[in-house]
Amino acid sequence: MSKKLLFISFVVSLGGFLFGFDAGIISGVMSYVGPEFNLTDGQIGWVVSAPSWAAMIAMIFSGRLSDRLGRKKILLLVAFLYAVSALLSAYAITYEMLSLARMIGGLAFGAALILAPMYIAEISTAENRGVLVSIQQLNIVLGFFAAFLSNYFFNKYNSPEHLFLNDENVWRWMLGVELFPALLYFLALFFVPRSPRWLYLKNKYIEAKQVLNQIHGKNRAEKEISSIEKSIDKDKELQQVKWTDILKSSLRFIMIVGLVVGVLQQITGINAIYFYATSIFKQTGIGTNAAFSSGILLSSVTVLFTFIAMYLIDRAGRRPLLLVGTAGIAISLLLCAFGFSQATYQLKLQDIYHFKFEKSENLIPIAGNEYQNDVDFKEEMKTILGNSTYSKNDGLILEAATQINATLVMVGILGFIACFAFSLGPVMWVLLSELYPIKYRGIAIGIVAFVNSFISS
C-alpha cells in the first residue's frame, strides 16, 4: 500500500473527523447554551439533532450530484460548508441562528459521510479496500476524541472572572474552534486527485490512467485500469440509472442488506451516547468536571477499538465482526438499562446547605424526599429552581442526589462503545462501498445513508 494512497484516503476522510468533532463538541456546548438562550428541553433537542435532519437532505442528492460533477468538487463544497457552519455557530446571537448554523454543518457531514467511502472504494484495490474505507470511521472517532478533549480544557479553564472564557462565551469558543480543521480539510483537498473511476465514466481516460499511476505505480495501475474498464463496460450495458432502478429484483437483496445494517447501526443509540455524553455521565452522579473527563475516556476507547477493527476487517472478514460486535452491544446496553433502572435520587439537608447557587434554599422543604427516576427528580428541580438555574447547576445537584451503581453503568457504556467501534461503526461503510455496482453506488448509498440519518434523528 503506497503512502500516496494512505494520504489521499486520510484527507478525503477528514470530513468524518469534522462530523465526529461536531457531534462530540455539542455534548459540552449544551451545558452552556441552554441557560444562555433559556432553551426548553425541546429546543435543546432540536439544536442537537438539527444537523441530522439537514444531513438527510444532503444524503439524498450528494451521491447523484457527485456522479455529475465529481467527488472532489462536492467534497470541496463540504469543507466550505463546515467552515461557514463553525463561524455562524460561534457568532450566533439567537436560538434560530444557532439552529441554522448547525443545519449548514449537517448538509456538510451528510455529504461527507457518503462521498468519502465512495471515493476511497474507487481508488483502492480489493486487498486494502476494507482498511482504507475504515479510515473514515477512524477519523470520526478521532474527531470525537478531539472534541471531548477540547470540551474538557475549555470547561477546566472556564471562570466567571475570565474575560473570554466564562459561562456566557465559552461555548462560542467550543464551536468556533471547528473552523481550523475545516480550513485544513479545504486546503488539503487540493492535493487530492479526481476519482479515476469517475474520470473513466466521463471518458477522461488519460487523466484516469495518470491518477492510477500516481497512486499504485505503473504495474499495479494496469491491473486496476483493466478492472475499471470491465466494471464500467458491464454498467454501460444498462440504461441510464434512475431512482426507481433501485427497486429492481437484481438489486433488491443488496438494498435490503444495506438498509438493515444502516438501521441497526442507529437503533443501537450510538449518536445519543455521543451527543449527550456529558449529560449521561452527569446523571451517574460523578459531577460536571468528571463528566467532561469521562468523555475523553469514552473517545479513547473508541479510537483503540477502531484500530482493532481496521486490523481485523480484511483478516477476519466483515460478517464475524458484525456478529460479535452486535452481541456485545446488546449485553452492554442491558447492563446500562439495569443500572439506570435501579437509580434513586435524594437530596439531604447537608447537601443543600453546601449549595451556593441562587434559590438553593428553596430546596430545603424536599430534603429527604426520594425519587425513583430521574425524570420526576429533574422536573421537581426545574419547578423549584427554574429551568435556567437548574441547567447551570445540574451537575452539582445530580452529583449530590444520585444513588446509582456508577461502575456498572460505566462498564456498560464503555463496553457498548468498544463493541460498536469494531463492528457496526466501520463495517457499515465498508459494506456500502462494496455492495453496489458503480453505476448505482451514488443513489444506493444515498438512500441507505438517508435512512440511517433519519433513524438517528
Residue ranges and their predicted role:
Residues 1-457:
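Transmembrane-helix signature of 12-pass secondary carriers
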